[in-house]
Design a protein with these regions (language model features):
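Alpha-helical membrane-protein architecture signal
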Residues: 2, 36-39, 68, 72-75, ...
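Generic alpha-helical transmembrane segments of integral inner-membrane proteins
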Residues: 13, 17-25, 29, 75, ...
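Periplasmic/extracellular loop-to-transmembrane helix junction in inner-membrane transport proteins
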Residues: 1-15
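Glycine-rich helix-loop "coupling/hinge" segments at transmembrane-helix boundaries
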Residues: 61, 138-167, 171-173, 198-202
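C-terminal transmembrane helix and the adjacent membrane-cytosol boundary/short C-terminal tail
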Residues: 34, 91, 167-203
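Transmembrane alpha-helices
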Residues: 13, 76, 109-141, 173, ...
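Short cytoplasmic-facing helical segments at TM-TM junctions of multi-pass membrane proteins
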Residues: 85-124
Length: 203
């Protein structure tokens, strides 16, 4: 049980970390693209409506079965909420603050690092939080292509008509999702600038 729980968490963590590293820079880049950004976000929204099992099945002809295609599929899925929230969060930064940054001689990179990302951090973290919780649930389907994790118990239970196996897989997944949601909620609170915290508290 402990091994399967760790395996499940490992698959989810690798996928979401890779998703963050890919989606945040891409989201920032899209805010610099006057043309095409809306189309990309629209495609992302459409892809997110596809069944996760279909995405997993899509990677089988490309990468075979096992942990690698499972992580690849989960990585692909993890990018979507993070990319959308990064794009939305950066666009939501007050333009007057950016003009002020230019006025004091900030480079484009300094504006991103010191102004845009800190102010967009709560929205980006909300995307990471959503993505992480989704992935913990979706990772149960990794068992379908030999990726392991707690989904193994669920699939065994379904195949053998043994509800205790289903419970043995479903309960830890629920606990993991709740724990990750709590921890990322605390992180989201910490990365929120004090000024934004005051606005939220007042509302």
């Amino acid at each position: 049980m402990l091994y399967k729980t760790w395996e499940h968490l490992y698959i989810s963590l690798i996928a979401v970390m890779a998703g963050i590293l890919a989606a945040v820079p891409l989201g920032v880049l899209l805010t610099r693209m006057k043309r095409g950004a809306g189309a990309v976000i629209g495609i992302v929204n459409i892809i997110q409506t596809l069944p996760s099992l279909a995405i997993l099945a899509f990677f089988i002809p490309l990468l075979g079965v096992g942990k690698i295609p499972a992580v690849a599929a989960l990585f692909f899925y993890s990018m979507l909420p993070i990319l959308r929230n990064t794009y939305t969060g950066i666009l939501g930064v007050n333009r007057h603050l950016l003009e002020s940054g230019k006025g004091i001689g900030m480079t484009a990179w300094e504006q991103i690092r010191l102004v845009e990302l800190p102010l967009a951090a709560p929205v980006i973290m909300a995307g990471i939080r959503t993505s992480s919780i989704y992935l913990i649930g979706w990772a149960t389907l990794a068992s379908f292509i030999g990726g392991g994790g707690l989904g193994d118990y669920i699939f065994i239970g379904l195949n053998l008509y043994q509800p205790e196996y289903i419970i043995a897989g479903a309960v830890p997944v629920t606990v993991l999702a709740a724990a990750v949601d709590y921890m990322l909620g605390m992180t989201e609170r910490k990365v929120t600038p004090d000024g934004l915290k005051s606005i939220k508290d007042a509302s």
